[in-house]
Amino acid sequence: MRNRIWIIMVLFSLLLSACEKWLDVKPEDEVDANVLFETGQGYRNALNGVYNNMAEVSMYGKEMTWGAVDVIAQLYSSFTQVTAWSKMMDYAYEDTDTKSIISSIWSDTYTAITNCNNLIEQVVGEDPDVFVLGEMERNLILGEAYALRAFLHFDMLRLFAPAPAVADNRGYIPYFEKHGSLAEPYLSVDSVVGRVERDLLRAKDLLATYDTVGDNSSALLTVYRLNGDPNPFVDIEDLFFFYRGYRMNYYAATATLARVYDYAGRGEEACKQALEVINATGVNSNGGARKQCFTFTEVVGITIVETPKLHDGVIFGLSSSTLIDDYKPYVPEGGGGNVTRLRVDKDAIYEKSVEDQRAHLVTTEGYSLKYQEHRGSDAVDDLIPMIRLSEMYFIVSDYLYRNGKTVEIAKDGEINVKDGIRMLNDVRFGRGITVHGQISNVDELEDAIIREARREFIGEGQLFFYYKKYNKKPVDKMVYYFPLPDNELIH
């Protein structure tokens, strides 16, 4: 592996505006790693480069969210022309076009992992005095790098291996932890989960030294986490510490760990991590009581189109300045000439509900507004949601229902006792639904959670993994994981 990486040369502005984010930067040069890591700014640039890797169209900027991964979840209506996506919808994974998409997902994800490893190896032994905030900033960068390495490996596991509940002891994917390594042994599903868990626990310990300390917790409230409002607790001249929702913050690592435990069938541990996120609070800059960090976006009727991503509940997201343009060709409103249209069956998904506010985010013809251009001041047009509060509720709901348990949820200074059904209904209520169907067994609960996932995660690449986790199929021919790219079969 060459000791050179693409990095982002960042020009920080001293004045914060609504469209300025630490992540809004462009690649300009290739710099030797020895030069890059001479300064604290170089470490920041290297970390930023990983996030930019992840936002590329071959990864979460398209294929691993609203592209291929939502296609194989059967989210979209049938395509009228033969394309790579129409072949993926039929699980024709041996086709040349689909192989190309799968290969790019694999190779670009492992490239991002390589960049994580380079950063980790460099920052571990670095003198804290190199960083503006010393040890605290060093821990922050290292914690994010560990968490991102775990996050990326976990998605490779979800895409290229069977679910833990049905997995055998075969090796499915490698887990790279050393920069420069060209090959690592292929590990079993359980072994990969163990390494992901270890990296996330490391990350939580490191990130806690910044995100949960004193007034820093205020940065995880929505107005600062995603909207970027001026924060009286943070130096306004240093944008590196703004927009924690666009970075792998402490609660993003916690939510990822909840996702991992849930996928692995470790319900009690998943519930514990998810509840930590649900109950998270931050310092209120107005001097009042602490506020919930993550909430369900409050909207009234059609005004929901001003907040199409319902971002108050987004725990972690990526920034893509080209997201709207990348999405335009696939919807009539974009005026693009692409023959592929990403249309969903609105009536089937929302069951003609007059209450579900998410239904306003899909046009009558079935096109999602989530990644189209918006005029609302809080539209966060560049945001690609990666982990949501609703997922944490689904995790807790599942565990409580299966085990006949209840938990205490703190909200607005009050403690409420919830069981599994109430946790699921809280998501529905948060989206405007007041009438809920009956659930009488685990199978019906799983079906109900899948229905909510279809409504909640349009364009976010998560629905497929609910089918996989519950071993259910929207179509009989669904295949639960990709074959390895051809160039990996030599291992």
Regions found by a protein language model. Give the residues of each.
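Alpha-helical solenoid repeat scaffolds, predominantly canonical TPR units
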Residues: 115, 192, 199, 206, ...
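Hydrophobic-face positions in mid-chain alpha helices that act as interaction patches
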Residues: 209, 221-236, 240-250, 262-389, ...
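Alpha-helix C-terminal capping/termination sites
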Residues: 155, 162, 229, 263, ...
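Conserved, well-structured interaction surfaces
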Residues: 44, 83-160, 182-190, 206-207, ...
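Membrane-proximal, proline-rich intrinsically disordered regions
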Residues: 19-71, 320, 421, 425, ...
